[in-house]
Amino acid sequence: MSRRTDKVNELLRREIGTTIQRDFEFPGTIVTVIEVEVTDDLKEGKVWVGVVGKMAPSQVLEKLNSRHGLIQSAVARRVVLRNTPRLTFRLDDSAQRGVDLVNLLEDIDKNLPKAPPADAENDGE
């Protein structure tokens, strides 16, 4: 991937994220644009989103993909490119895996026996 493509990917990631926050509502759910990958000719772009919260990720993706034209138009007004890529949204489940891992660690911590205070260890000498 070229340096220019990397810059376009980052610019689109920010603009798509802003558009989603401003124009869409996902009650009780956080939707984050993780990464954007455009083709070298800028005709197509894959948008990887993380979904954490009450809504099913499939519902979020369905809503975003069904309204990709609105998102593309909003991005085209703010970003000047020869072509505005046709966007397709895909799930990046790393955010949900991170939340699940934190919850698992908290559960393990609750079930571990408590360590004796540091002072109690020194009193036995």
From Swiss-Prot:
GO molecular function, one term: ribosomal small subunit binding
GO cellular component: cytosol
GO process annotations (BP): maturation of SSU-rRNA
Stretches that traverse the bilayer: none
Annotated PROSITE patterns: RBFA
Keyword field contains Cytoplasm: yes
Places the protein is found: Cytoplasm
Function: One of several proteins that assist in the late maturation steps of the functional core of the 30S ribosomal subunit. Associates with free 30S ribosomal subunits (but not with 30S subunits that are part of 70S ribosomes or polysomes). Required for efficient processing of 16S rRNA. May interact with the 5'-terminal helix region of 16S rRNA.
Subunit structure: Monomer. Binds 30S ribosomal subunits, but not 50S ribosomal subunits or 70S ribosomes.
Family indicated by similarity: Belongs to the RbfA family.
Protein name: Ribosome-binding factor A
Source taxonomy: Bacteria, Pseudomonadati, Verrucomicrobiota, Verrucomicrobiia, Verrucomicrobiales
Gene: rbfA
